[in-house]
Structure formats: structure tokens, C-alpha cells
């Protein structure tokens, strides 16, 4: 989703979530706004080998062309989506000012076919591996207390752990006071991220929130 792997998980995690959704009758919805057609042509669901019930996509379905996004899923759920009202039928209203815009649809179709033709996901993934390995080497060489990791072409360079807290304490879990207690620490970490982002930019390295590189 929008955090694009900020909290890294193993392949078995999503399979466990899938099993829980099946057990309790809940829909499994994947936010693939960032990961769709990026970590793999089949997105994060292909990368993790898990089939969600519904999937949300962002601008990629329009090849970066404006006014594009998408929702896909299993037929049994997608057939409940409707752009209008149908008497006597259960429907979930889905619509938008530019929904089903033909130019955006064509742009997306063409872009995805080109991604497939050029094997772009795999090539970008190898570049992500190379960049991450280089960052790890630099961190080790200079003894920096940072962490670098990646999922394909999505690379993370974490210098503050902005949202990393110890949730092992039951007292912390039972009350929102835990987060309030640590709010000053959160602000300090956020400020550090912003400063790192500015330093990266000054040296020609564009990041998102001072930690992510696509």
C-alpha cells in the first residue's frame, strides 16, 4: 500500500491473513497503489503468492496518465459493483467523474503490455537489489546505525525508525496513552527523516519521506 513495505513482512504473513479471512468470512483487500505492476507484473499478490478478494490500483492502470485508478477482484464480488441503481438487486455503488474514461483505459492497457514486453518488473527488481546491496555496503563501511532493505525495485533506507515502537507490553497495548507518551519521540524522528530527505535531495537523491526510493 502507500507505506510500500515500510514494515517488512515475510511471505508467510499474507498467507496467514488469507487463512484468517477465509476462517472468519472477511474480505481480503490488497492496496496495490504502489506495488501493482511494480514488484511483479502480478503485483504484490504475485510476489507473495496470495490471491486477495479485491485489489485497488492507482495511476499505473493508466500508465501514469491523469485521472486513472482501478478496482479489480473475484467475479463473485465484482458483479456486485454498479454505476447505477438496480431495483431488487444488491449493489455497491461505484462511480466517478471520469470512470471508464476510454483514453485512460487505452493508456493503461498499452503501458501494461509494454511492461510485459520489456520485462520491466524483473529488470527494475534487479536494479533495486543492486542499489540495496550498495547501500548496505556503505552502511557497513561507515558504521552507520541505519537499515537498508528492499522488495524488488522498492528500496528503503531507514535512519530513524519513525514508527518503530515496542508493542510487547500489554499496558502499552491497552491504552492509547502509550502513543501519546511517545509523541515527542515521534516528532524527533519525523524531523530527522525530513532532514535526511533534504540532505538526499541536495546530493541528487530523490526519496519519499526521506526513506523510500522507487
Predicted regions: what is each one?
Residues 1-214:
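Conserved N-terminal phosphate-binding loop of PLP-dependent enzymes in the Aspartate aminotransferase
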